[in-house]
Curated annotation (Swiss-Prot):
This is 3-phosphoshikimate 1-carboxyvinyltransferase. Keywords: Amino-acid biosynthesis, Aromatic amino acid biosynthesis, Cytoplasm, Transferase. GO terms for molecular function: 3-phosphoshikimate 1-carboxyvinyltransferase activity. The keyword Cytoplasm applies. Catalyzes the transfer of the enolpyruvyl moiety of phosphoenolpyruvate (PEP) to the 5-hydroxyl of shikimate-3-phosphate (S3P) to produce enolpyruvyl shikimate-3-phosphate and inorganic phosphate.
Length: 441
């Protein structure tokens, strides 16, 4: 355990950059490893989750190296060229690595065992096992479809048409990646749109992929298999999920005026910023541009008094990871914020609904937990009291709980004690040092 008390340290000023987008980092390594030739990646997020993906692709034959300037070089094996790994693939804490790599392995004639840490081993994999089994892959999983899990891939696999029963970019991506080495056309039908990095990047690497909208509004995504992917040069934009912590911090701490540079604003990911604007947050987009098919801008954020709202459940897929820090913003808003439709948060790295209710209550917020969300009565802009001496927030090995409550701490009177800051390294290794530099006078 590495506990830490986060305390008010003055306004956030100046300009900061956040690390590369986690979703794009994972996919650039995976698709680079399936292309023929060298893919070069700058701005890669070097957190533990992405490094788990890189280690797994190395174990299956790709050559992946980082040079002294921080550029990553990926020499791929070609679609269909993945090799049998010699030992279990350790996914650490990364649900994304696990589910997407299961898709890749499922349609190669290899067998792989996936293992993970205590938190990942509690997360259900059944939603990925179901469609991949239909394609012909075989699974031996721990009870409840959990890790450790052994997957026996099949080639040639059977192309399927799969309608997602629950909005999940990871399940969608797993099936599309499985489709790359499957003869014919693999189809995913998505009733509610989720983040579309996989579609954008598959096209960018040269896969034949189409997206149509059905009569009922569902997205119909088709990928033609036995593709030949071409290597790419990728500049990874800053991660909006990481930027979220600093955007909320600057809104809450009086006197703040902060620019967060190079933030990816993919519309399937950036709903938090729209919700915060609806609450009265001053968030301005400067220097809007497009990098590698992804919209990017610098965000200028100024301290604002937020007002509570009813958050439309339709935005959930576009900000599913940002709710913990939105709860912190709501705790200091004027009036009541109501969130619904958040069942998915109960099966993240922790049960984020109950974990954040307990954490915010400990810090002095007024919170009611419901089946599918939280109802938060804000302080009207006053700082939270903070946690009492000897009391610390339980993060449940969840990086987003730890970082959200760190932000609550810098917007509190007495500070917030977080029981363990180590999980932060999974997605944002420089979070604490960046927070210190933003609040340094």
């Amino acid at each position: 355990m590495r506990p830490r008390r986060f305390t008010a340290n003055g306004p956030l000023k100046g300009r900061i950059g956040v690390p590369g987008d986690k979703s794009i980092s994972h996919r650039s390594i995976m698709l680079g490893a399936l292309a023929v030739g060298e893919t070069r990646v700058t701005g890669l997020l070097e957190g533990e989750d992405v490094l788990s993906t890189a280690a797994a692709m190395r174990a299956m034959g790709a050559t992946i190296e980082r040079d002294a300037d921080g550029m990553w070089h990926v020499h791929g094996v070609g679609v269909g060229g993945l090799l049998q790994p010699q030992q279990a693939l350790d996914m650490g804490n990364s649900g994304t690595s696990t589910r997407l790599l299961m898709g890749l392995v499922a349609t190669h004639p290899i067998t792989a065992t996936f293992v993970g840490d205590a938190s990942l081993s509690k997360r259900p994999m059944g939603r990925v096992i179901d469609p991949l089994s239909t394609m012909g892959a075989e699974f031996t999983a721990s009870p409840g479809g959990r890790l450790p899990l052994t997957l026996r891939g099949i080639s040639p696999a059977v192309p399927i048409e799969y309608r997602l029963p629950v909005a999940s970019a990871q399940v969608k991506s797993a099936v599309l990646l499985a489709g790359l080495n499957t003869p014919g056309v693999t189809t995913v039908i998505e009733p509610i749109p989720t983040r579309d990095h996989s579609e954008r990047m598959l096209r960018g690497f040269g896969a034949e992929l189409t997206v149509d909208v059905a009569a009922d509004g569902a997205r119909v995504i088709r990928v033609r298999g036995e593709a030949e992917l071409k290597p790419q040069d990728i500049a990874v934009p800053g991660d909006p999920s990481s930027a979220a912590f600093f955007v909320v911090a600057a809104l809450l701490v009086e006197g703040s005026d902060l620019v967060v540079e190079n933030v990816g604003l993919n519309p399937t990911r950036a709903a938090l910023f729209d919700v915060l604007r609806l609450m009265g947050g001053s968030i301005e987009e400067l220097n809007r541009r497009e990098v590698g098919g992804e919209p990017v801008a610098d965000l200028r954020v100024r301290h604002s008094l937020l007002t509570g709202i009813d958050v439309d459940p339709a935005v959930v897929p576009s900000m599913v990871d940002e709710f913990p820090v939105l709860f912190v913003a709501a705790a200091l808003a004027k009036g009541r914020t109501v969130t619904t439709g958040l069942e998915e948060l109960r099966v993240k790295e922790s049960d984020r609904i109950s974990a954040m209710r307990a954490a915010l209550e400990l810090a002095g917020a007024t919170v009611t937990e419901t089946e599918d969300g939280l109802i938060i009565d804000g302080t009207g802009g006053d700082p939270l009291p903070g946690t009492a001496e000897g009391a610390s927030v339980v993060t449940h090995l969840d990086h987003r709980i730890a970082m959200s409550m760190a932000i609550a701490g810098i917007a509190s009177r007495n500070g917030v004690e977080v029981d363990d800051t180590r999980p932060i390294a999974t997605s944002f290794p420089v979070f604490e040092s960046l927070l210190e530099s933003a609040t340094r006078p």
